Curated annotation (Swiss-Prot):
One of its GO terms (cellular component) is plasma membrane. InterPro entries: Glycosyl_transferase_4, PNAcMuramoyl-5peptid_Trfase, PNAcMuramoyl-5peptid_Trfase_CS. It comes from Paraburkholderia xenovorans (strain LB400). This is Phospho-N-acetylmuramoyl-pentapeptide-transferase. It catalyses: UDP-N-acetyl-alpha-D-muramoyl-L-alanyl-gamma-D-glutamyl-meso-2,6-diaminopimeloyl-D-alanyl-D-alanine + di-trans,octa-cis-undecaprenyl phosphate = di-trans,octa-cis-undecaprenyl diphospho-N-acetyl-alpha-D-muramoyl-L-alanyl-D-glutamyl-meso-2,6-diaminopimeloyl-D-alanyl-D-alanine + UMP. Pathway: Cell wall biogenesis; peptidoglycan biosynthesis. Its cofactor is Mg(2+). GO terms for biological process: cell division; cell wall organization; peptidoglycan biosynthetic process; regulation of cell shape. It is an enzyme of class 2 (transferase). Belongs to the glycosyltransferase 4 family. MraY subfamily. Its EC number is 2.7.8.13. Catalyzes the initial step of the lipid cycle reactions in the biosynthesis of the cell wall peptidoglycan: transfers peptidoglycan precursor phospho-MurNAc-pentapeptide from UDP-MurNAc-pentapeptide onto the lipid carrier undecaprenyl phosphate, yielding undecaprenyl-pyrophosphoryl-MurNAc-pentapeptide, known as lipid I. It is found in: Cell inner membrane. GO terms for molecular function: metal ion binding; phospho-N-acetylmuramoyl-pentapeptide-transferase activity; UDP-N-acetylmuramoyl-L-alanyl-D-glutamyl-meso-2,6-diaminopimelyl-D-alanyl-D-alanine:undecaprenyl-phosphate transferase activity.
Length: 389
């Protein structure tokens, strides 16, 4: 919004040309989202407290968590508010990638909001059924996947439509340009051609998988938000590189026209996340709930797909992957041993993984900070793939 205004006025005020610099707008988006979160946070906490949307705590979990019962949840609305305002103010609103990422983020946010609302307002511990939640995630994920399959390699929505129609005329058998290939980290000249169907399936799995993985990780004060900020900031660097014809050529990456604008979105997400952490650090004054976790995970997955860094997201989001695998392994092993031995057995003391460490004697703050450190190391490793190729 401000970019369009600055471009209109810059002939009369040359200093407004600074708005054309992505880095300037990224910094301003971070500051804007951060300030919105810090200013609005207390009001959001009071409102959630008045609505009596307190978090229920599992009685079979760590006993130290019982004091958290009643802490306001659904605080993810504060994050989404900061992201929305900062992105709308500082991003180029003619950019197609901005809108598809916003659609996925807020679409998943609505799903999470409905789930949280049913749990805490209607006192339904199940919230949305797994089938219902997965259905709506699939609708949004598949829509984004189909659109991105034809937009990643094109420079405008007109070209996206032309490519889509060419695919239809080919009997749904046409391949995609090299820009849409699956990129392998640390290898500069090898990529895997996915084709339209392969791209759609992979994109769907990345977006929906990332959303649920972040949601599973959200279980301790401050645990999930800092990894989201770190991974989002790292993806913002990739977006800046891929969106620049100069840097992408120098670093031997495909140039994806318009991807650089996602740096603004990632910066807004980082600022909003840090503001939320101000109130979510131990002892937390509010939790983000599904409305925040599902939305942020979907955002990370969508940005990773656009900048063709699905594998790097898997690396940098290693904490999310480990948490998800711990749940899958725990459930699978329990069901297998129950059928085999008549009694279910557990691989971990409790899943997701962060609860296993708590029950093993780690303090909550130790788990959180150590997971942050691991994520920072993984993000630096992921960023190293920019040059080590």
């Amino acid at each position: 919004m401000l970019l369009a205004l600055a471009q209109w006025l810059q002939n009369d005020a040359s200093f407004l040309r600074v708005f054309s610099y992505l880095t300037f707008r990224a910094v301003m988006a971070t500051i804007t989202a951060l300030l919105i979160g810090l200013v609005c946070g207390p009001a959001v906490i009071r409102k959630l407290t008045a609505m009596k949307v307190g978090q229920a705590v599992r009685k079979d979990g760590p006993q130290t968590h019982l004091v958290k019962s009643g802490t306001p949840t659904m605080g993810g609305v504060l994050i989404l508010l900061g992201i929305a305002v900062a992105t709308l103010l500082w991003a180029d609103l003619t950019n197609r990638f901005i809108w598809i990422v916003m659609l996925v983020t807020f679409g998943f946010g609505v799903i999470g909001w409905v789930d949280d609302y049913r749990k805490v307002v209607y006192k339904d511990p199940r919230g949305m059924s797994s089938r219902e939640k997965y259905f709506w995630q699939s609708v949004i994920g598949l829509f984004a996947a189909v659109y991105l399959a034809f937009s990643v390699s094109e420079a405008s929505n007109v070209r996206v439509y032309d490519l889509f129609m060419a695919w239809v005329r080919s009997g749904l058998s046409m391949g995609l340009p090299p820009h849409a290939d699956l990129m392998l980290p640390f290898v500069k000249s090898i990529s895997y051609p996915l084709g339209v169907w392969g791209f759609i399936v992979l994109t769907y799995l990345v977006i929906v998988g990332a959303s649920n993985a972040v949601n599973l990780t959200d279980g301790l004060d401050g645990l999930v938000i800092m990894p989201v900020v770190l991974v989002g900031a790292s993806l913002g660097v990739f977006a800046y590189v891929m969106g620049s014809s100069v840097y992408s050529k120098y670093l031997l990456f495909p140039h994806i026209a318009g991807a650089g604008e996602l740096l603004i979105f990632c910066s807004a997400m980082g600022g909003a996340g840090l503001a939320f952490l101000w109130f979510n650090t131990h002892p937390a004054q509010m939790f983000m709930g599904d409305v925040g976790a599902l939305a942020l995970g979907g955002a990370l997955g969508t940005v990773a797909v656009i900048v063709r860094q699905e594998i790097v997201l898997f690396i940098m989001g290693g904490i999310f992957v480990a948490e998800t695998l711990s749940v899958m392994l725990q459930v699978t092993w329990f069901k297998f041993t129950k059928r085999r031995f008549g009694e279910g057995r557990r691989l971990f003391k409790m899943a997701p993984l962060h609860h296993h460490f708590e029950l093993s004697g780690w303090k909550e703050t130790q788990v959180v900070v150590r997971f942050w450190i691991i994520t920072l190391m993984l993000c630096l490793f992921g960023l190293s793939t920019l040059k080590l190729r």
